[in-house]
């Protein structure tokens, strides 16, 4: 088992356990400055406090930040590729001076740690975007950097009170110290870690088992359950999948643990970061995938990263990382032999192969299409179908646009009456909302349960509009409407017909 990065596992929870009560009292005092941690900061601080980000013991000061951005190293020369920063707004930054102590809270209620400030600085975000994320403004991390993150960073050391509170899967959330003890108790000194933010299927099981056998090692399934790429499948669905698929491994070869990481999708730099984290968790080997941690393509169809950039950068640091890199070897299904094999060992001009892309899988889930057993296990498909029901079982919402001149009440009643005659498999409701933005979540709950909503009035403030949310469709005369009317005073019967045909075309009704 490799030593932690930097030589010492920086478990701040264990280090500060004896002064926890003292720190708790300080955090709850009325005269201490308080910062409520953002979702990304909560992920980052958990991995600082539990040692997953060893050798870090706090958020980066300006010297360390600048060195990481430009040279992929901390100021002392230690390899570190991603800046871990506490971003705040200008108003909060103006309250801070060196040596200020700040209580860091989760959800404004749970004290997590106290930060002793070393410095407050305004980063050059343009340089950070270019050096760390290669500068494409469409990169999700660059969008976050300029549109979400605060304009000032606070550097300083942390004293731990407790880890962020999670109410799901407590038995699967092993800290680095706990996972290292688990490996020791099992006498696993060689462990291949597998990083994923997606559901796993038979090909993933095959490639991880092959990697373990080639390395004479065991397998750590170590999925990210913090922040991933926008649009990814939710972690609850994925964890249920992982819990099922791990049963398909040979007995005693695999272990599942969840990683509360906020991914940056920064490709090659992130792959090095992932390797460091897995070393801290006790893994001796790490599978680096094709286009590892890349966000795919931009709107022009150009890849943000090359397919092998990550593998090449991690390999270039292998002597410093002290963890063996296992290149991801894509496997494909051979239907004539009913087995999987590495695609680089197959002559595809002579051997028939089958594969289902992620896009095709999502399409089949959406329309209720067949997902063959050679691709995924039945229990995995069942979980995915429960979380991604086909369109006839999904809910929807029809928002009546502001330009309509027909009676909204009568149109709503006409739509409701028409929908009800199609059968009782879906709940319908006319939803008058009275400009209450907090009802947005309620609308999504109705849609998520497979119901059909009719919303006679939009919110006046566009930022609070439901239009544009998943399965929410605007009925209006505007060119941006999902269901476009030729005129504001079309007869109600014509409008109802257009709505029904639209919903049928999009799979909500099957006649």
Swiss-Prot record:
Annotated positions binding sulfate: 195, 197, 293
Residue(s) at site: Transition state stabilizer: 201, 204
GO CC list: cytoplasm; mitochondrion
Keywords assigned by UniProt, alphabetized: ATP-binding, Cytoplasm, Nucleotide-binding, Nucleotidyltransferase, Transferase
Region of interest (N-terminal), residue spans: 1-167
Database matches in CDD domains: ATPS
EC number: 2.7.7.4
Cited Pfam families: ATP-sulfurylase (PF01747), PUA_2 (PF14306)
Protein name as catalogued: Sulfate adenylyltransferase
Species whose genome carries this gene: Saccharomyces cerevisiae (strain ATCC 204508 / S288c) (Baker's yeast)
């Amino acid at each position: 088992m490799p030593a932690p990065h930097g030589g010492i596992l920086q478990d701040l929870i264990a280090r500060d356990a004896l002064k926890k009560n003292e720190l708790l009292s300080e955090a709850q005092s009325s005269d201490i400055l308080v910062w409520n941690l953002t979702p990304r900061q909560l992920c980052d601080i958990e991995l600082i406090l539990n040692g997953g980000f060893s050798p870090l013991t706090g958020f980066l000061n300006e010297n360390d930040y600048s060195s990481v951005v430009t040279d992929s190293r901390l100021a002392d020369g230690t390899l570190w590729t991603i800046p871990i920063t506490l971003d705040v707004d200008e108003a909060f930054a103006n309250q801070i001076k060196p040596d200020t102590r700040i209580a860091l809270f989760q959800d404004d209620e749970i004290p997590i740690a106290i930060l002793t400030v070393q410095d407050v600085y305004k980063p050059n975000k343009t340089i950070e975007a270019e050096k760390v994320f290669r500068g494409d403004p469409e990169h999700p991390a660059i969008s976050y950097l300029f549109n979400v993150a605060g304009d000032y960073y606070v550097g300083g050391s942390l004293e731990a009170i407790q880890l962020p509170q999670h109410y799901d899967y407590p038995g699967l959330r092993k800290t680095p110290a706990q996972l290292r003890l688990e490996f020791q108790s099992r006498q696993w000194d060689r462990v291949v870690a597998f990083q994923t933010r997606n559901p796993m299927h038979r090909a993933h099981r095959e490639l991880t088992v092959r990697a373990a056998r080639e390395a004479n090692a065991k397998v750590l399934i170590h999925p990210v359950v913090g922040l991933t790429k926008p649009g990814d499948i939710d972690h609850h669905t994925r964890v249920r999948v992982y819990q099922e698929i791990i049963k398909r491994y040979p007995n005693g070869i695999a272990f599942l643990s969840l990683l509360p990481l906020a991914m940056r999708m920064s490709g090659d730099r992130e792959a090095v970061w992932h390797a460091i984290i897995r070393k801290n968790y006790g893994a001796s080997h790490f599978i680096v995938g094709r286009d590892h941690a890349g966000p795919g393509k931009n709107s022009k169809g150009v890849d943000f990263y090359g397919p092998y950039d990550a593998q090449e950068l991690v390999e270039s640091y292998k002597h410093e990382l002290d963890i063996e890199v296992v290149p991801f070897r894509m496997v494909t299904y051979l239907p004539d032999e009913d087995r999987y094999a590495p695609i680089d060992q197959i002559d595809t001009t002579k051997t028939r192969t089958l594969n289902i892309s992620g896009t095709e899988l999502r399409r089949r889930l959406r329309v209720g299409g067949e997902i063959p057993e050679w691709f995924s296990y039945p229990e995995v498909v069942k979980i995915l179908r429960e979380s991604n029901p086909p369109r006839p079982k999904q809910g929807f919402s029809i928002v009546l646009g502001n330009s309509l001149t027909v009676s909204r009440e009568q149109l709503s009643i006409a739509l409701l009456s028409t929908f009800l005659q199609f059968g009782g498999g879906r709940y319908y409701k006319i939803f008058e909302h009275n400009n209450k933005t907090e009802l947005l979540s309620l609308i999504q709950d109705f849609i998520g349960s497979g119901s059909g909503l009719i919303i006679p009035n939009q919110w006046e403030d566009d930022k609070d509009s439901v239009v544009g949310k998943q399965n929410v469709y605007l009925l209006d005369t505007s060119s941006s409407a999902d269901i476009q009317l030729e005129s504001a005073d079309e007869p109600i019967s014509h409008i109802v017909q257009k709505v029904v045909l639209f919903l049928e075309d999009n799979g909500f009704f099957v006649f």
